[in-house]
Structures are given as structure tokens and as C-alpha cells.
Amino acid sequence: MKKKFLIVAAALIGSQLSAQEDTTVRTLDEVVITANKFPQKQSGTGKVITVITKERIMQSGGKDISQLLNEEAGIIVNGATSNPGKDKSLFLRGATDKYTLLLLDGVPLNDPSGVGGSFDLRLLSLDNIERIEILKGSQSTLYGSNAVAGVINIISKKPVTKNPQFKGLLTYGGYNSFKGNANLSQKTKILEYNVNYVYNTTDGISEARDTTGKANFDKDGFTQQAVQTVLGINVTDKFKFSPYYRFSKFKGSYDAASFTDAPNHYSASLSNTGLTSQYIYKNGTVFLNYGYDFTKRNYTSQYGEFITNGKFHHVEAYTNHNLSKNVHFVAGLNYQSYRIDAPDTTNSILSPYLSFYFKCAKGLSAELGGRWNHHNQYGNNFTYSFNPSYLVHNNLKLFVNITSGFRAPSVNELFGPFGSNPNLKPEKSNTQEAGLQTAVAEKKLEFTITGFNRSINNVIIYGFNGYENRDKQHDYGAELEAAYAVNKQVSIKINYAYVDGKITQKLSTKDTTYYNLIRRPKHNVHLFVEYNVNKNLFISSSLQVTGKRIDNDYTSFPASQVDLNGYALWNVYAGYSLLKKKLTIFADIKNITNKKDYYEVYGYNVQGINVTGGIHFQL
């Protein structure tokens, strides 16, 4: 498989090297906001950050957010190519999803009723997202609990026109899948608004795999609806506040287990509301944000109905302030509370934090910060970050990150109905990163190389007596991201990720250490070729190569380990714009070779070839 991939890659690259016109890639000049909570060029921060642009999202009309994230270096979304309604598990640099913090416009998303407080990606729609910033490595100093492996900041679309603008999307594809999206927005001097609605439905496929081909497993469909309303009110040219309300719900069917059909049903809903505000003063900006998430889940099976409710409050005030041309700081205070209804229990955490950014000399910069956390149950803990970087001739950035992080035990783990333990302590991590980012060949070729090492102590596991702090997790790996602008029309991008890890079980008799990255490949590669044929026609092709993995076979007791073969998926997209780009017709073909002889999860189906056609339009 690796040999075939290299041959394809060489052929694709070689066929384009004779192109005559030059262009550049400009990732180092790209402005991001997630790295340090203020706008900053990537060349000025030592943190590892990847941006999914609005153009890339626009060209993903046939995908959902899990499939888009699954294309990024170091990210595996297990379930992205399985039944559309199947639960999704996000792994960032080998860490499970409870160690990655999701933000929506800078405000955390959290479901206290979920396992480990993890947020369900199926509650998010890709259709009102402007861009996504992926910040890798421990970020607990600025973002608090769960930001151990990294932070993913989902940034919603903003109004851009003085007159009301209506945009829409209609798609139809395989498995009788339909999606419709409508968006109305306007931006004036005083008021701006963005109203969005999406409806998405599919018949899907059977979640469980029928190895006999004769059992006639039923299809497990999925339906999602989401609405969003965001207002922006400019009280003065220095003070602005934005109330928002988002509601999302989905329902569908799921099967009993590996290779086992069942008429089970599930539903979930999210009410997400709050307020963001900012005040600009002479040397900086003050922000005050509030967010509230209410998540409800309902599972119905032969064992009856199971309902969970989770409520999450987030209040944060912070300022970014310029002390001088070369010294900048961010200082803030954050309060969060987590509540479940069965039993009725609330946890809270209060955290002041401070981070300094220094431009020490020409090309040299550093970030140094700390965060103190007071939890109403376990007490206090502290995290720190140190991120020096050096920019050479504006085209080579060298960086080192030395950080600590933490994950507070969830309210479910502390006081939930199953195996809870009120004496749990926070999981604590230490992460080291080093690498370089550079642009060469007149900035036509840009690449980033990063190595990381992460250890997590006091890992919370579910043992014979319920939840307990017991084990130690150690993960390490490397990532490569490269982009080459062949000419003004053709670009080639590739990313590669390697991750390895092991857990040390601290048992009463002796410690046991073994590889435990279930469903995560050691090697993962994505290759993209993009071709702007002319000002109206865009074509892209991508190849995903996923290495072999391990999983557990739960059809036997005790569960036994099974090997999952590696696989390669080839996708093609084409879009054609009309009427001064107010109308775009597109086709998205996923898994063009119809490969179905692999598993993401042992015993569960994957999608074969899936053709989606659709239109983007604006009035």
C-alpha cells in the first residue's frame, strides 16, 4: 500500500513540475486568533496551529465536519466514513476526545452528561462555519480543563454586506441523502445579524456489518436540524456586544453491537446561548463572554429508555494589553460550572490566568504564562506554558513549546449514577514540542515539521470499583505538513502523522505497560492536488492512506484484540461557478474505488462510493 501511494504521489507531482507560472503560499503570514487570544501572524507565535479556510469549507459541500477534520494532520475522527449517523470519536495526536477542547467563536462547548464531558460532533453543522483553527499541544494556561492535546476553535460566518444577503445550499447524494441550508445576513454601521437554518437527512446504511449478506439488516438513518441567530450591536466604535442563540437536534437509529442488528433509536439536542462583548481602549481590548450549553440525550433499546441532561455555564473576562511595542500580555478570570440532573449535582472551577508575549530581539519571541485553578471538589492545581520561537529572514521559524495541562474529573465521574468517585483528582499532563516552519523556493514551497512528547498522570479509568485515578499515559510522535504552489493554477498539499503510545497500569502487584492506541493508526497520510482550471472551474483530488490499527472484539468474553487492516480512499471534487460566482454547481465523489473491506470500528460498516451533487447560491 505504501509503495502504491508513493508511486501515485510522485506521478502527480512530476506531472506538474514543468508548469511555467509561479505563485506563493502564505501560511506564515496568516493571521490567527486562537494561539494567544489576540490577532497574530503565524510567524509571530511558537505554537503549532493549522487553519481550515473558508475556501476549503466552501469546497466541502458533500462532507460533514467530522470528515473535514479527519483530513488534517494528527487528527483521526473514528466514524467519519462509517454510517453517517454513527457516533464520532475525535483523536488528536493519539489522545481521546476528552483531552481536546472544542470552542465555538472562542467559547467552550461542553456536555457534562457525556463520557468525560466530551462534546458530540453530530450536533455541529458545517454549513455556517467560516473557518476552523486547530491549535495543537497543551493549551490549559489560556483555555483551562480538557485542553491537553489541543484546542479546535470553530469560527462562525460573519455578515459582510450592507444590504441583506441570502445564501443557500442544496445537495442530494448517495443513501438518499438530502441537505438544505438557508442563510440571511446583513452588516450596517450599528447592527449586524446572521440567521441560519439547516436540514440534513439520510437513509444511511446498517451500522452493524452483516458478514453473511443474508441477514437483511435494516438501514440506520439519521436526521439533523439546526438554527442559529447571532446579532452584533455596535454601541460605539469602541464597544460592541453580540448575543446569540443556537439550537441543534438530531435523531436516528443504531444497532446493538458488532455484527448485531437491533431496532434501537436515539436523539440528542443542544441549546447554546450566550453573549460576547468587547471594548477597545488605547492600549488593548477587554472581552467579556458568557456561554450556556444545555444538552439532552435519549437512547431507546430493548433495555428501556435512558435519558441524560447536562448543563454547562462559562463566564470569562480577559484583556489583551500592549505594555510596549515589544511586550504584550493577556490576563483573565474564568468561571465554569457543570451540572447533571441524575443525580442533581453541580461542580465548578474558578481560574485566573496570565500570559506574557515578548519580542526579545530581532526575530526572537517568547510566550510565558500560568493558570491557577480552584475546583470546588478536589481543590487547587496550576498549569504553565513556555513557548520561545525564532524567525530567521522572515521565512524560517524555529519553535519549542514546554507546557503543562490538566483535565478536571467530569461531574459524571465524580457524582454520576455509575461508578462515581467524589475523591478523584485532576489528570495532569506535561508536553514538549519542537519543530520548524519555513517557506522556500520564493515561497512556493512551505512546510512544517513538528515532534511532540506527552505524558498524562493520574489517568482516570473505570475499574472494578468504578472510576479511579490510576494509570499513566505516554504518547509521542511527529507531523509533517507541506504545500507547494506549482503555478497560479495548481497546488499540491500533503500531510503525514506518526503517533505511538502506551499506558502503564499501576496495579497492586506490579506495573504493566503496553500499546493502547485503539483504532488509531501509527501512520496516516493525506495528499491533495488542487487545480483552478479557469476563473470558474475548480477541481481537486485527494488520497487518504490510513495504516493498520488494533481494536477489541466484544463478541467474545473477555474481549480479545483484533488487527484492523490499513486502507486507502480516493476522493474527487469539482465545482463550476456561474453568474459572477453567485451560483456554484458541484459534485463530490468520495471513496471513488468503492472500497468497503475495512473497518473503522470492528464489526461495523463503512460507506462505499458516495456521489453528492449540489448547488451554492446567493441573492
Regions found by a protein language model. Give the residues of each.
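Short acidic/polar hinge/loop motifs at secondary-structure boundaries
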Residues: 108-136
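Conserved C-terminal beta-signal and adjacent last beta-strands/turns
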Residues: 6-9, 19, 233-234, 400, ...
